[in-house]
């Protein structure tokens, strides 16, 4: 299977896993146009769509794609805001699509019903885990989001994270503000700057790299606690407390 990142909007990625015969699994098509263009240029033929959550920039292209390919299968979380013709999938379920097994992982926090898909060594994390960051908690709680991130962090280090947005440089600015002496993080920022200067995606990225550089996955490290503690209104009694304060800090941060 070949992985393709299709840019959409200002900073979204639509992901496509493409078989040798051109049949493809499409993840989070917020726009139809990039998928239609890939079909025109590369002979890509969508056979199924996977949705991680209901936000418009992740599902907005579904109707047009189903008009173009009426037999297109659709899978997403059990949520009334997901297109009604979707097959609902939940935690622990496995899908076999184009001879590839997709494992469904429940990751509430960004939204209450958010899911991720793990397949062929690739983690399609939607807006839960970002390169050097994590999603805002629009509907979930800090304990939920922390648990979701820990669930993803427990996957093999060679797992490639395919998230929904090109946020690496913006997230790097905050991460370095929190963890300025992290040499691996400094290198990642430099690499990401070079990649973006060349108009290349900074994704996918290995989970091993994220574990070394993403502050939201490093709440057990003393340097992260030390950075967060002065901002906290009360004692940080757990990693969840550290995570919650770190997320509040990120919400307020301006580079």
UniProtKB/Swiss-Prot annotation:
The record's section on InterPro entries has:
Clx_II_MBL, Glyoxalase_II_hydrolase, HAGH_C, Hydroxyacylglutathione_Hdrlase, Metallo-B-lactamas, RibonucZ/Hydroxyglut_hydro
Gene Ontology biological-process annotations: methylglyoxal catabolic process to D-lactate via S-lactoyl-glutathione
- Which residues are noted in the entry as Zn(2+) 1-binding? 53, 55, 110, 127
Pathway, per Swiss-Prot/TrEMBL? Answer: Secondary metabolite metabolism; methylglyoxal degradation; (R)-lactate from methylglyoxal: step 2/2
Q: What class of enzyme is it?
A: hydrolase
Transmembrane ranges? none
Q: Which cofactor does it need?
A: Zn(2+)
Co-factor remark: Binds 2 Zn(2+) ions per subunit.
Q: Name one GO molecular function term.
A: hydroxyacylglutathione hydrolase activity
The answer to whether the entry has keyword Zinc is yes
Q: Which residues bind Zn(2+) 2?
A: 57-58, 127, 165
Origin, by domain of life? Bacteria
Q: Which UniProt keywords are given for this protein, alphabetically ordered?
A: Hydrolase, Metal-binding, Zinc
What is catalyzed by this enzyme? Answer: an S-(2-hydroxyacyl)glutathione + H2O = a 2-hydroxy carboxylate + glutathione + H(+)
What EC number(s) does the entry state?
3.1.2.6
The record's SUPFAM superfamilies line, in alphabetical order, gives: Metallo-hydrolase/oxidoreductase
Alphabetized Pfam families for the sequence = HAGH_C, Lactamase_B
Family under the similarity heading: Belongs to the metallo-beta-lactamase superfamily. Glyoxalase II family.
User: How does this chain assemble?
Assistant: Monomer.
HAMAP family with a match to the protein in the record: Glyoxalase_2 (MF_01374)
Function (record text):
Thiolesterase that catalyzes the hydrolysis of S-D-lactoyl-glutathione to form glutathione and D-lactic acid.
The protein's name in its UniProt record: Hydroxyacylglutathione hydrolase
